[in-house]
C-alpha cells in the first residue's frame, strides 16, 4: 500500500512555499546572505519544531523567512520544493506565497515573484512540472496593508492565479478582508481562504459568502455545523486539508482522530496537502502514509483523494483531463 501511495499521481493545493524551507537550505542561504539565525545548527532548528498551536509555529516560521533576501534565494527554495514534487509524484502544485513577510523587511515584491516563477519555469522545462502561484494576505495585519500588497502585486498579475488569506486565524475573521478580496476578483483573480482550522465554522460561512472563495483551506471544523456541511456537499466546495499539520498544531490530538476520511465518506470534496512540510514533518507522501497507518485508508479512498486534488485545482478543464488521465492509467495498472 505504501508503494501504491508513493506512486499515486497527485496534486498539492495547500502549500506555503516559505514553509517548505528546510533547515539545511535555511542555513545555507543565511550564510550566503550574512543573516544570523537564532539557532546554532540544523539539529537545534529541528528541535524547535515542536509546537502547541498555530501561533508558536508562526513565530518560528517568520524567523526562518528572514534569510530570504534575493531573487536566487526564492528560486532555490522553490526549486527544492518542486524537485520534491517530482520525487513524490505530485504532478501539479499550487503554491501560496506571503509577500508581506518579505516586503515588510524591505524586499521588493518583484524580487520575490521573479525568483518563484523562474524556478517554476525551469521545473516545467526540465521535467514537465505543472505549478501555479497564489498570493496570500497575512490576516494578522490590516486590510489596508493587504490592499497595498495587492496594488504592488498587480503589475505581476500574469504570474499568479489567485489570492488567499493565511496566518493567525482566531480574532481575524474573513469579513475583515472583504474589500481587498472584491478588488482581487475585479482584477480577474480567483479567491481562497484559510478558515475553520482553529477558527469556528462561522469563519467558513464568511469566507464563502463575503470573500466568495472557490476553495476553503483547512475547513476541518465544518463538521461542527450540519447546515455548513450540507452546503459544502451540495456546492462541492473543495477543502484543502492538511493532516500532519493538524496533528503538529494540535487541531487533532492524533492522526487516528482526524476527520478527513469521515468528511470524504460524507461526500465532501476533500484533498490531502502538506501545508508547511519543512516544519510539520512531511510532504505529500508522508501525509498519505500517516493517514493510511492511523486511520486506516483504503486504496479507493486514496484514489478519490487524488482525483479530488486535480478536480479542485485551478487548471483549465483540458489540463485537468490530461492529469486525470494519468491518474486513471496508474489506477488501471495498480
UniProtKB/Swiss-Prot annotation:
Substrate binds at residue 276. It comes from the Bacteria. Its EC number is 3.5.4.2. The active site is at residue 197. Its cofactor is Zn(2+). GO terms for cellular component: cytosol. The record marks 218 as: Important for catalytic activity. GO terms for biological process: adenine catabolic process; hypoxanthine salvage; nucleotide metabolic process. Keywords: Hydrolase, Metal-binding, Nucleotide metabolism, Zinc. It is an enzyme of class 3 (hydrolase). One of its GO terms (molecular function) is adenine deaminase activity. Pfam families: A_deaminase. Binds 1 zinc ion per subunit. Zn(2+) binds at residues 14, 16, 194, 275. InterPro entries: A_deaminase_dom, ADE, Ado/ade_deaminase, Metal_Hydrolase. It catalyses: adenine + H2O + H(+) = hypoxanthine + NH4(+). Catalyzes the hydrolytic deamination of adenine to hypoxanthine. Plays an important role in the purine salvage pathway and in nitrogen catabolism. Belongs to the metallo-dependent hydrolases superfamily. Adenosine and AMP deaminases family. Adenine deaminase type 2 subfamily. PANTHER family: ADENINE DEAMINASE. NCBIfam families: aden_deam, PRK09358.1-6. This is Adenine deaminase. It comes from Hahella chejuensis (strain KCTC 2396).
Amino acid at each position: 500500500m505504501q508503494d501504491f501511495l508513493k506512486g499515486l499521481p497527485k496534486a498539492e493545493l495547500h502549500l506555503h512555499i516559505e514553509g517548505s524551507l528546510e533547515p539545511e537550505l535555511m542555513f545555507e542561504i543565511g550564510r550566503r546572505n550574512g543573516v544570523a539565525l537564532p539557532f546554532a545548527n540544523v539539529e537545534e532548528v529541528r528541535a524547535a519544531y515542536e509546537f502547541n498551536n498555530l501561533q508558536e509555529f508562526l513565530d518560528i516560521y517568520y524567523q526562518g523567512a528572514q534569510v530570504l533576501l534575493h531573487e536566487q534565494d526564492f528560486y532555490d527554495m522553490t526549486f527544492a520544493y518542486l524537485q520534491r514534487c517530482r520525487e513524490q509524484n505530485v504532478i501539479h502544485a499550487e503554491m501560496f506565497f506571503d509577500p508581506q513577510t518579505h516586503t515588510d523587511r524591505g524586499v521588493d515584491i518583484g524580487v520575490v515573484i521573479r525568483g518563484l516563477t523562474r524556478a517554476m519555469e525551469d521545473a516545467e522545462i526540465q521535467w514537465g512540472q505543472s505549478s501555479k502561484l497564489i498570493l496570500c494576505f497575512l490576516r494578522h495585519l490590516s486590510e489596508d496593508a493587504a490592499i497595498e500588497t495587492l496594488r504592488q502585486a498587480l503589475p505581476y498579475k500574469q504570474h499568479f492565479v489567485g489570492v488567499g488569506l493565511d496566518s493567525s486565524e482566531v480574532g481575524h475573521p474573513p469579513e475583515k478582508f472583504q474589500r481587498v478580496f472584491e478588488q482581487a476578483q475585479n482584477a480577474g483573480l480567483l479567491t481562497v481562504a484559510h478558515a475553520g482550522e482553529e477558527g469556528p465554522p462561522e469563519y467558513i460561512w464568511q469566507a464563502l459568502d463575503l470573500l466568495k472563495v472557490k476553495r476553503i483551506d483547512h475547513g476541518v471544523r465544518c463538521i461542527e455545523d450540519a447546515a455548513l456541511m450540507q452546503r459544502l456537499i451540495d456546492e462541492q466546495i473543495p477543502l484543502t486539508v492538511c493532516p500532519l499539520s493538524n496533528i503538529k498544531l494540535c487541531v487533532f490530538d492524533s492522526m487516528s482522530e482526524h476527520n478527513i476520511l469521515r468528511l470524504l465518506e460524507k461526500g465532501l470534496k476533500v484533498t490531502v496537502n502538506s501545508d508547511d512540510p519543512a516544519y510539520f514533518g512531511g510532504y505529500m507522501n508522508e501525509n498519505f502514509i500517516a493517514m493510511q497507518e492511523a486511520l486506516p485508508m483504503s486504496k479507493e479512498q486514496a484514489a478519490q483523494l487524488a482525483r479530488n486534488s486535480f478536480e479542485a485545482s485551478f487548471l483549465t478543464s483540458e489540463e485537468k483531463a490530461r492529469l486525470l488521465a494519468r491518474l486513471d492509467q496508474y489506477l488501471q495498472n495498480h
